[in-house]
Amino acid sequence: MMVFRVEELVTGKKNSNGSSGEFLPGEFRNGEYEAAVALEKQEDLKTLPANSVNLGEEQRKSEKVREAELKKKKLEQRSKLENLEDLEIIVQLKKRKKYKKTKVPVVKEPEPEIITEPVDVPRFLKAALENKLPVVEKFLSDKNSPDVCDEYKRTALHRACLEGHLAIVEKLMEAGAQIEFRDMLESTAIHWACRGGNLDVLKLLLNKGAKISARDKLLSTALHVAVRTGHYECAEHLIACEADLNAKDREGDTPLHDAVRLNRYKMIRLLMTFGADLNVKNCAGKTPMDLVLHWQNGTKAIFDSLKENAYKNSRIATF
């Protein structure tokens, strides 16, 4: 079987040795090859059946007609709003589409940390501060004391109460942590809870028997601490639990003295509403009202000074 090249089929010519070989460009000059190829293409088009072209056009036309009919049906279905029920159905369908589109992100719960190695005291105290319950549980499960403390005698319970880590507070108390353990400034867990401002921890301590009247080295009660740090809910709960409104610290100040000095309006109103004494004098002989007047006079003196300086500057500017 002989193999012919395209050029031989188109022109009907062969090379000099009469067999299918390398194409000789010298045999076709002045565009003879291009003309032969163009002629062959025209002959191919002539050989195509005439009805095949017509069939392709008819198919395209029929597809266009079908698309137009489908669009028309959709528009007719949309326009058929005979009553309110049809409108409600459409609204519900749109809502369902929206719900399908919005994917609710699945939040994976962190795997529980498994502690196998022994936990030392510094790591245990740090875990209580940073809310790392598995570390605390491992330390306690190894029969260690929950009342170990740092150089300032602050225990894990003090730290957890400050940060409001309720689960750790519960775990420490289950292990026998002392609620009335005092740090270097003689603050107890209830002082630290009010300093941190966590109401749930404060409630837990009181329910477990924490002394509401406990005082630190400055003779401050938990109510003093709550007022100074501005934790309104803690102060309100302490008052509801019958904390002493007029308890004096080492300087003779009551919680109301502290509230006035720090200009905590909500605390002042809270204490006065529940009957705090306005006439109690501190060690300097000042009542809460005296502090208000002193603050007003001090503020008035500052404004008078500023006003006088502004007047002097204006006089200098005129000369």
Curated annotation (Swiss-Prot):
Record GO biological process: cardiac muscle tissue morphogenesis; cellular response to hypoxia; cellular response to interleukin-1; cellular response to lipopolysaccharide; cellular response to mechanical stimulus; cellular response to transforming growth factor beta stimulus; cellular response to tumor necrosis factor; cellular response to xenobiotic stimulus
Expression induction or repression: Down-regulated by doxorubicin (adriamycin), in vitro.
ANK repeat ranges, renumbered to this chain: 152-181, 185-214, 218-247, 251-280, 284-315
Membrane-spanning ranges: none
MF GO annotations: actin binding; DNA binding; histone deacetylase binding; p53 binding; R-SMAD binding; RNA polymerase II-specific DNA-binding transcription factor binding; titin binding; transcription coactivator activity
Coiled-coil features, chain-numbered ranges: 55-89
Subunit description: Interacts with TTN/titin. Interacts with YBX1.
The protein's role, per its UniProt record: May play an important role in endothelial cell activation. May act as a nuclear transcription factor that negatively regulates the expression of cardiac genes.
Protein's name in the database: Ankyrin repeat domain-containing protein 1
Organism: Rattus norvegicus (Rat)
